[in-house]
Swiss-Prot record:
Source organism per UniProt: Salinispora arenicola (strain CNS-205)
Annotated S-S bridges: none
Protein name: Translation initiation factor IF-1
Pfam families, per database record: eIF-1a
Compartmental location: Cytoplasm
Gene that encodes the chain: infA
C-alpha cells in the first residue's frame, strides 16, 4: 500500500499505552511522540503492547503526533 505524500516513516518503540488507543512512542532518534493506531490495524484487531517495535508515520506539519502503521512480529 503506498504511503501518503510527504509522510515520514520512522521506527520506534512503544513506551506506554494511553486511553483511546493512543500510545507514547520513543523513536529511533530519541524523540517521544504521541501516536494512534491506523484504521487497518484497528480493523484487524492487531494488539500493541509496551516494548513493541513499530513503524510510525509522521506528518511534516506536526512532528509530535503520528500514526502507527506496522508492528514488528
Amino acid at each position: 500500500m503506498p504511503k501518503k505524500d510527504g509522510a515520514i516513516e520512522i521506527e520506534g518503540r512503544v513506551i506506554e499505552p494511553l486511553p483511546n488507543a493512543m500510545f507514547r512512542v520513543e523513536l529511533a532518534n530519541g524523540h517521544k511522540v504521541l501516536a494512534h493506531i491506523s484504521g487497518k490495524m484497528r480493523q484487524h484487531y492487531i494488539r500493541i503492547l509496551p516494548e513493541d517495535r513499530v513503524v510510525v508515520e509522521l506528518s511534516p506539519y506536526d512532528l509530535t503526533r503520528g500514526r502507527i502503521v506496522y508492528r514488528y512480529k
